C-alpha cells in the first residue's frame, strides 16, 4: 500500500505537484562548442546567464504554486557527504563510465577529483574535465596514445537540466534509466546515488521498477503516468520495445499498475520522446502534436494488461481517443492540437516544445511563452496557463515537463 510518508508518490500526470527535482544549468552549457554540439545532442549553444535567469523564473513559478523545489546538484553533494566510501566508489564509477576503467588517466582523474571540495567536485563532473586540467606524463603509453585534439577527458553533461529523462516516478517507486546516447548515459548515476544514499530517500523501501543496468534503452520523457493503474510509454527514438516490456512486467508483478499503453511515435530528433508530442493536462484533456496522427487521426498503439496468471496480454489499436477513453474510464476526451492544428505553426511550436506542458494541478499547466498559439489554444479549452520565458532554455530541445522530475503529487479525486 502507498503511504503519505513515502518520499516518492506519483499516481498521475495532473495531481497537484508537491515536490520536484530540477537542475539549474551550469558551466556544462558553456563547455558546448560548434564541434561538440552534435555529439552532445544540442542544436545550438544557449547563453548561460540568460538560461539561468529563465530557469530561476521557472523554479520561482513552481514555488509560487506551492511546489517544493529540490536541486539535483545539492542532493548529489548531500548524498556523497554521508560516507567517504560512497564518495570514492562514485568517483571511480563515474571515471570508468567516462571511458577510463583503469590506468594512469583514471588514477590522475581520481586524484584530481578527490582533491576538490565535494560541491566543487560535483560541479566539475557535471561541467566536464578538460585535458589541460590534468597533468599527464607523455612517457606513459596510455597517455601518449590519447587523442589530444579532444578538449575533454570527461565530457560535459549539458542535458542535465532535463531532469525528467534519467528517471521517472511511478506510484511509490521509479525507473532509473539506461539512456540511449552516450552523451547522457552517466546522468542516471546521479539518480542512483541519491536514491541509495541521500537521507531523504535511502532505506525508505522505494521500489526501483527498472534500474540502469540494462542494454535496452528507456528515458523518462517517454513515461507518462496517466492514473494510479495506467502508464503510457512512448516507443520512440529513445525508448525500445524491450524496455517497455521490462517495465510492464515489473509493474504488473509489484504494483497496482495493470495497464501499460505503448504509443509508437516517429523516431526523429524533433519527436525524441512521447512528451514532445503528447501530454496530459486535465482529467480528460491532452495536448497532441497533429503530425503524429495520420489523416484519420490514428497511430500505432499496443495495450498491455496483466492477466489472471500475471502474464502480459497484448491488444493492438490505432485510435488514441478510444484507447484513452476505455483505459481511463472516460465518456469524453478532448485532444488539444499543438499550434491550434495549423500545420506550419504546429511544426514550429512543437520544435520549441509547445506540446511539452507540465501540469501542476488538474487543468493548470506551465508552458514556454514563445509558443503563444498553442498557449492560447489551451486557454480556449479552459486550461489555466502559466508562461515562463524561454529564449535560451528552449535551445536544448526540451520544455517545462522535460526540465522537471516530479517525485510527489497529490492523488486526484476519482
From Swiss-Prot:
<comment type="pathway">
    <text>Amino-acid degradation; L-arginine degradation via ADI pathway; carbamoyl phosphate from L-arginine: step 1/2.</text>
</comment>
<dbReference type="Pfam" id="PF02274">
    <property type="entry name" value="ADI"/>
</dbReference>
<comment type="similarity">
    <text>Belongs to the arginine deiminase family.</text>
</comment>
<feature type="active site" description="Amidino-cysteine intermediate">
    <location>
        <position position="402"/>
    </location>
</feature>
<dbReference type="InterPro" id="IPR003876">
    <property type="entry name" value="Arg_deiminase"/>
</dbReference>
<keyword id="KW-0963">Cytoplasm</keyword>
<keyword id="KW-0378">Hydrolase</keyword>
<dbReference type="GO" id="GO:0019546">
    <property type="term" value="P:arginine deiminase pathway"/>
</dbReference>
<dbReference type="GO" id="GO:0016990">
    <property type="term" value="F:arginine deiminase activity"/>
</dbReference>
<dbReference type="GO" id="GO:0005737">
    <property type="term" value="C:cytoplasm"/>
</dbReference>
<protein>
    <recommendedName>
        <fullName>Arginine deiminase</fullName>
        <ecNumber>3.5.3.6</ecNumber>
    </recommendedName>
</protein>
<keyword id="KW-0056">Arginine metabolism</keyword>
<dbReference type="GO" id="GO:0019547">
    <property type="term" value="P:arginine catabolic process to ornithine"/>
</dbReference>
Amino acid at each position: 500500500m502507498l503511504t503519505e510518508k513515502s518520499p516518492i508518490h506519483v499516481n498521475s500526470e495532473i495531481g497537484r505537484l508537491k515536490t520536484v527535482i530540477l537542475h539549474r544549468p551550469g558551466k556544462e552549457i558553456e563547455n558546448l562548442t560548434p564541434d561538440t554540439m552534435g555529439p552532445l545532442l544540442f542544436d545550438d549553444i544557449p547563453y548561460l546567464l540568460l538560461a539561468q535567469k529563465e530557469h530561476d523564473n521557472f523554479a520561482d513559478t513552481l514555488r509560487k504554486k506551492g511546489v517544493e523545489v529540490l536541486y539535483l546538484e545539492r542532493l548529489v553533494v548531500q548524498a556523497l557527504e554521508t560516507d567517504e566510501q560512497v564518495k570514492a566508489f562514485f568517483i571511480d564509477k563515474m571515471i570508468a563510465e567516462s571511458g577510463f576503467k583503469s590506468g594512469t588517466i583514471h588514477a590522475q582523474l581520481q586524484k584530481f577529483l578527490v582533491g576538490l571540495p565535494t560541491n566543487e567536485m560535483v560541479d566539475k563532473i557535471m561541467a566536464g574535465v578538460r585535458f589541460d586540467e590534468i597533468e599527464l606524463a607523455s612517457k606513459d603509453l596510455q597517455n601518449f596514445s590519447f587523442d589530444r585534439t579532444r578538449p575533454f577527458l570527461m565530457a560535459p553533461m549539458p542535458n542535465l537540466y532535463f531532469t525528467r529523462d534519467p528517471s521517472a516516478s511511478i506510484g511509490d517507486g521509479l525507473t532509473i534509466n539506461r539512456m540511449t546516447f552516450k552523451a547522457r548515459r552517466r546522468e542516471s548515476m546521479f539518480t542512483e546515488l541519491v536514491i541509495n544514499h541521500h537521507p531523504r530517500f535511502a532505506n525508505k523501501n522505494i521500489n526501483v521498477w527498472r534500474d540502469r543496468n540494462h542494454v535496452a534503452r528507456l528515458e523518462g520523457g517517454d513515461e507518462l503516468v496517466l492514473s494510479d493503474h495506467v502508464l503510457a510509454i512512448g516507443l520512440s527514438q529513445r525508448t525500445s520495445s524491450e524496455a517497455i516490456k521490462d517495465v510492464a512486467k515489473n509493474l504488473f508483478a509489484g504494483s497496482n499498475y495493470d495497464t501499460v499503453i505503448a504509443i509508437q511515435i516517429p523516431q526523429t530528433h524533433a519527436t525524441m520522446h512521447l512528451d514532445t508530442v503528447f501530454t496530459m493536462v486535465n482529467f480528460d484533456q491532452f495536448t497532441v502534436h497533429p503530425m503524429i496522427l495520420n489523416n484519420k487521426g490514428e497511430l500505432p498503439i499496443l495495450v498491455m494488461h496483466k492477466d489472471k496468471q500475471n502474464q502480459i496480454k497484448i491488444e493492438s489499436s490505432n485510435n488514441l481517443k478510444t484507447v484513452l477513453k476505455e483505459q481511463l474510464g472516460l465518456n469524453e476526451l478532448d485532444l488539444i492540437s499543438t499550434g491550434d492544428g495549423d500545420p506550419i505553426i504546429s511544426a514550429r511550436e512543437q520544435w520549441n516544445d509547445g506540446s511539452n506542458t507540465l501540469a501542476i494541478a488538474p487543468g493548470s499547466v506551465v508552458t514556454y511563452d514563445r509558443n503563444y498559439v498553442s498557449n492560447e489554444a489551451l486557454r480556449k479549452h479552459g486550461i489555466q496557463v502559466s508562461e515562463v520565458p524561454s529564449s535560451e532554455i528552449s535551445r536544448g530541445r526540451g520544455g517545462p515537463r522535460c526540465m522537471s522530475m516530479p517525485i510527489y503529487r497529490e492523488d486526484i479525486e476519482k
